[in-house]
């Protein structure tokens, strides 16, 4: 259906991403630092775990996508997961920050693996249907862009709020004091997350008409194999997520050891998210209407590339100029992250256009699979660079470690944003082509419905 969605529906949908990020953003902002500086897990072990478990999460996404595509209830295909999958997710979001500090190092690592894997699986079983829900709510391009913008703003505001709430609490705190801080906030956020998921469930409806029966796994996979725009978008998303999570995982180390002021952590997160994504997300629907989704992505990727390169060079002599450069990079990255959701939704119709099979869950899960791989690679790169450069927790760092941190937070994201630009430059699904596809699909559905009506009558 091509109707415009109300702002109440769009806001209600975005609250689901606030809840998502109560679990997700906590990990992105604080988990590596928690493992190394509080729980006593070695940097190399933590980096390896973050990489391997994120790869596990990626495969969990594919499993979740298949589960979602096989479900059909009176609440729809996607909304039931928001109702019944949230409690396990929120429980694991608490457990990952509850590593017993008096255990041996090996036992801590095993506990971290098990709880982080549990968090990843539960997150997949909620986030895959949540993301797929947007494709079932509307086929109207501007509404899809608004849904993407709303969830982008919601996610970024959540990042900023968590940084402001928790960042000052761990400033100059001992590891023992930080344990209590993390325990308190994870419990509070778990309860709030379950409430927000329920509001999201009540605020949304699945409106897109489905004619065909549930396809077999083989047919679903054949549909995916023919979807070239989806694969190109996945590679572009992989690069953007590597860039994003390299910055997130490096930020606390950057302010602590390069700037020597953990109080600047909230400023850094504010620039990255509020100034970046929240400033850029409202612009995306207008940009999409004027120049299309592909060109909007390209502009964002180019801004990100230039901003991160500038950030690397100026950060050694002027913090204010460095923050301006980071804001430019973050705006570009915010544009790409926001428009990415609308591009993914379009690939569902492209697959349906080619094969007659509509597989929202598996399509989104493949997209999320590559995003998780990007998160794994991006989140682990700083840990590996720290380990290779000789990082020792809670000590004055060597020049090699300082350069490693600066590389992780600037040059790594710069390179991957440039690669994303190159890949999407060749992306074939333009807005004009998408409109033609939607018209063709609607015409096919009308013919099918007429045939069904003629047979039954």
UniProtKB/Swiss-Prot annotation:
Pfam families: MFS_2. GO terms for cellular component: plasma membrane. The keyword Thylakoid does not apply. The chain crosses the membrane at residues 12-34, 38-60, 80-100, 109-129, 147-167, 181-201, 229-249, 264-284, 297-316, 321-343, 373-393, 409-429. Residues 1-11, 61-79, 130-146, 202-228, 285-296, 344-372, 430-457 are cytoplasmic. Induction: In the presence of glucuronides. Residues 35-37, 101-108, 168-180, 250-263, 317-320, 394-408 are periplasmic. CDD domains: MFS_MelB_like. Keywords: Cell inner membrane, Cell membrane, Membrane, Sugar transport, Symport, Transmembrane, Transmembrane helix, Transport. InterPro entries: MFS_2, MFS_trans_sf, Na/Gal_symport, Na/Gal_symport_CS. GO terms for biological process: carbohydrate transport; sodium ion transport. It is found in: Cell inner membrane. One of its GO terms (molecular function) is symporter activity. Gene3D superfamilies: MFS general substrate transporter like domains. It is a multi-pass membrane protein. Its main location: membrane. Responsible for the transport of glucuronide into the cell energized by the proton motive force (probably by symport). Import is enhanced by UidC (GusC, AC Q47706). NCBIfam families: gph, PRK09848.1. In some K12 strains, the protein is inactive for transport, probably due to a mutation at position 100. Belongs to the sodium:galactoside symporter (TC 2.A.2) family. This is Glucuronide carrier protein. It comes from Escherichia coli (strain K12).
């Amino acid at each position: 259906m091509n109707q415009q969605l109300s702002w109440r529906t769009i806001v209600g949908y975005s609250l689901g991403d606030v809840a998502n990020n109560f679990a997700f953003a906590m990990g992105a902002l604080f988990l590596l630092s928690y493992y190394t500086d509080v729980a006593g897990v070695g940097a190399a072990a933590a980096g390896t775990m973050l990489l391997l478990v994120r790869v596990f999460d990626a495969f969990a996404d594919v499993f979740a996508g298949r589960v979602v595509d096989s479900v059909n209830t009176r609440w729809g295909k996607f909304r039931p997961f928001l109702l019944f999958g949230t409690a396990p997710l929120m429980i694991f979001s608490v457990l990952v920050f509850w590593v017993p500090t008096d255990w041996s190092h090996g036992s801590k690592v095993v506990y971290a693996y098990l709880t982080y894997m549990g968090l990843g699986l539960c997150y997949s079983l909620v986030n895959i249907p949540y993301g797929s829900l947007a494709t079932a709510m509307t086929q109207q391009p501007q509404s899809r862009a608004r849904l993407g913008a709303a969830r982008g703003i919601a996610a970024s505001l959540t990042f900023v709020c968590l940084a402001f709430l928790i960042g000052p609490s761990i400033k100059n705190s001992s590891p023992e004091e930080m344990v209590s801080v993390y325990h308190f906030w994870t419990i509070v956020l778990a309860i709030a997350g379950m409430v927000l998921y329920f509001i999201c469930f009540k605020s949304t409806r699945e409106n897109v008409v489905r004619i065909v029966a549930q396809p077999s796994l083989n047919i679903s996979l054949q549909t995916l194999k023919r979807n070239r725009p989806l694969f190109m978008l996945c590679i572009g998303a992989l690069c953007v997520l590597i860039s994003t999570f390299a910055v997130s995982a490096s930020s606390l180390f950057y302010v602590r050891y390069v700037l020597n002021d953990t109080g600047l952590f909230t400023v850094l997160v504010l620039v990255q998210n509020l100034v970046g994504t929240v400033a850029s997300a409202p612009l995306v629907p207008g940009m999409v209407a004027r120049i299309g989704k592909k060109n909007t992505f390209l502009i964002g990727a180019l801004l990100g590339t230039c901003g991160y390169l500038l950030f690397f060079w100026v950060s050694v002599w002027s913090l204010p100029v460095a923050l301006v450069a980071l804001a430019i990079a973050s705006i570009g990255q915010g544009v790409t992250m926001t428009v990415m959701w609308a591009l993914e939704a379009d690939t569902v119709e492209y697959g349906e256009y080619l094969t007659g099979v509509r597989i929202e869950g598996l399509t989104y899960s493949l997209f999320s699979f590559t995003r998780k791989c990007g998160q794994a690679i991006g989140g682990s790169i700083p840990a590996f660079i720290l380990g290779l450069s000789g990082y020792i927790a809670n000590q004055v760092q060597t020049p090699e470690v300082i350069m490693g941190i600066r590389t992780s937070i600037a040059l790594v994201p710069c390179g991957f944003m440039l690669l994303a630009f190159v890949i999407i430059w060749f992306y074939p699904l333009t807005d004009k082509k998408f409109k033609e596809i939607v018209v063709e699909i609607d015409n096919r559905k009308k013919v099918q419905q007429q045939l069904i009506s003629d047979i039954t009558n």
